[in-house]
């Protein structure tokens, strides 16, 4: 007969972000443990709050299945020696089955006698096996662990109680001096201890003690109560899954309430108010029906509605104290012109090994001007970029950003607007941090995109120059994210930037005008490869076939926009009927050139043509060389493929005449160079 098994670890309050991952880990480890021990079960449910990690194993078998089976061992000639004595092989076979050589018998199978044993073993009781749950607790991992008392044992937070019930039977799992029983704890302030008669009583018993053990149920309670408040007051609340998830795991019994603050604080930029409420206090900001931020907030209490007025008042006082600080910083910062803050950047270190923030600003302007010229950007964009690059780090020395570091860039935008700067300049100051995460939003303005790329290129170049290069396991300065951001912005703006050409030019440009240690020439390619790896990440993220990714990255192409264009062409036509013969013809050319070790140092000489097919290929290649679009280039290869095949049918490539041979290899080399624009096609998997 199957019964439910309840296992609860009761702790001091855990950080909210740790709880869901920890209870999932507990369930996964338990699932593996039960399967390894041959205990059948239906499913595992999880329950979790800041003070408990709980699993409920549904329909767990009371014992392992009994074993009644025949095990085949070594052949008789291996199991016994010439005198009939048991060999080590036979002894090991028997021992491995929990038996002795006395239990071995022989039977013939396909003309050969083999050793067999008949294994009969009664399955172990679940109650005995479940004592091993203590090992699961010991094996659990966490970002940070704690020790308590004088023990060496570590856990995410000190353990205060354990519950271990198989049906109505206590399984006395033990950790340190704590032995599991049937008593759990209710809400820290509102509930009492509860003695559980049966594992199935868990959820309902805790509800009576103001603990909603099911995290999804708590989340639904929060959402429903918020919806009621919003509807009642004609408000709007923007969805925030991360904050909702966090408050769900901060409380055991959620009660939603609304608070307010003086309207005078609404003169502060919205982002400051939202940060004060959301990031510092875990409040949801509130908007009116027109989407305008208003002087109200919604929060979640860990408890019921008793004394809710006192709770609201206390939360309002805490928020107002933070808003008073924010108002002070805002007023103080606005007393000074932007130039006051820009001048102070010379005293701000970008990095000890690289130099000051003022020096970085100088380098970034030079990089941006170089890129703008390369991309032939309009004069107004260059003008706005130059001004934005002069200002873009000034807010780092404002009091507001000193208190709210997460608002760097945002406050720069607001202060620049207040100072009368052009909107493009102001927005670019904010956008240069974008994307803030790997897949975060990109800059929406051209100036912002240019400033973001220039800033990130400078960071990567100078960190590589200072020897602070990411390893496979360590990237403390987020250089991979910066490089990925560069790739995403380039592709979004459709800007061409072959890094093998550009990086040496940028480094040469910066040398002599900045004290930062810049990479030597032998590091140029290392940086280019580093950024190229982020192109691979982009292609993988966008679901390109693995062989197409391998092909386009194995080409000599260094421009991310061209690499993406090639990948799009190959992905689009991968399943076309013509794709296989085109690729086979082009890879045949590469194989011939590789075998001949031809380096392409010979010009094609029409006077050496001996057949019309050579002229046809020559003209076809010349036409393809005029094509810029990779999509059109592929279609050109589709048209050229029969010409290539005819060329091979008629001509002996490795002709005895050295000049003719080299001329034909030169023709093939010209085709190969064009094909390389699409990728190293030998990497493609063609079916």
Curated annotation (Swiss-Prot):
Q: List the disulfide bonds.
A: none
Domain of life the protein comes from: Bacteria
EC number(s)? 6.1.1.14
| Locations listed in the record | Cytoplasm
Q: Which reaction does it catalyse?
A: tRNA(Gly) + glycine + ATP = glycyl-tRNA(Gly) + AMP + diphosphate
Q: What class of enzyme is it?
A: ligase
Q: Which GO terms describe its biological process?
A: arginyl-tRNA aminoacylation; glycyl-tRNA aminoacylation
As one GO molecular function, the record gives:
glycine-tRNA ligase activity
Instruction: Supply one GO CC term from the record.
Output: cytosol
The record's family statement is: Belongs to the class-II aminoacyl-tRNA synthetase family.
Please give the subunit comment from the record: Tetramer of two alpha and two beta subunits.
The molecule here is called: Glycine--tRNA ligase beta subunit
Q: What is the lineage of its organism?
A: Bacteria, Bacillati, Bacillota, Bacilli, Lactobacillales
